[in-house]
Amino acid sequence: KACRNKRWNVTIFDKDPKALIRTRNFIYPNRYKKWDKKIRLISKDENLFYDLIIIGTPPDSHLNIANTILDKNLCKVLHIEKPLCTPDLKGIGNFLRKVEKSRIKVICGYNHIFTKNTFLAKKLISKNNKIGKILTITAYNREHWGGIFAAHPWLKGPHESYLGHYRKGGGSLCEHSHAINLFVHFSHFLNLGKVKVVNADIQFEKKK
């Protein structure tokens, strides 16, 4: 919708024709009141060159798709939804080497660092000498996946999506990794250096 608001030509590709039908008849009209007839829907990759390609598939498929786009030089800008890949970082080294050699501008969907409140916080920190030395940074991402499943009622729960599987890039850590991104962003902004040690407490609950 954001792309159409800018009056860009938009093509949605999904190898599953049923997903495209669901997008046209249910998802888009429910969110934006009616379907936009100027949006193209395709189920076969046409290998055309685009100004912008957005990868919005499950995280465990991101790098494979992105590598193909980089190899074929299919766009000017490649936007990959977060998280960039799965927690095991499998294939990330090869991907980053391709990015360095490519003319394609590659970005990831951590957009919270560009919000008005983030800019305001940085402005206040820069101008207010009363804050003093920064001792700790705490980042919260108070979000619940209930909204996601409300928008995808054909899913019976997390188990039917990557969201319920952390190895596939789901789970609370990956799905809500905006908080990690904000933490690192402010750490760099305050010249506090890179993360050296990571410690986490996780409680797993198995439900029958």
Where are the regions a protein language model picked out?
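A structural signal for isolated positions on well-ordered beta-strands in alpha/beta enzyme cores
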Residues: 9-11, 107, 138
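Alpha-helical elements of Rossmann-like donor-binding domains used by nucleotide-donor carbohydrate transfer enzymes
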Residues: 22, 52, 64, 68, ...
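N-terminal glycine-rich "phosphate-gripper" loop used for MgATP/nucleotide binding
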Residues: 55-60
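Short acidic low-complexity segments
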Residues: 35-50
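Predominantly a Rossmann-like dinucleotide-binding segment in NAD(P)-dependent oxidoreductases
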Residues: 115-207
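Beta-strand-loop-alpha-helix segment that lines the small-molecule cofactor/substrate pocket
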Residues: 52, 63-113, 129
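N-terminal Rossmann-like dinucleotide-binding module
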Residues: 1-33
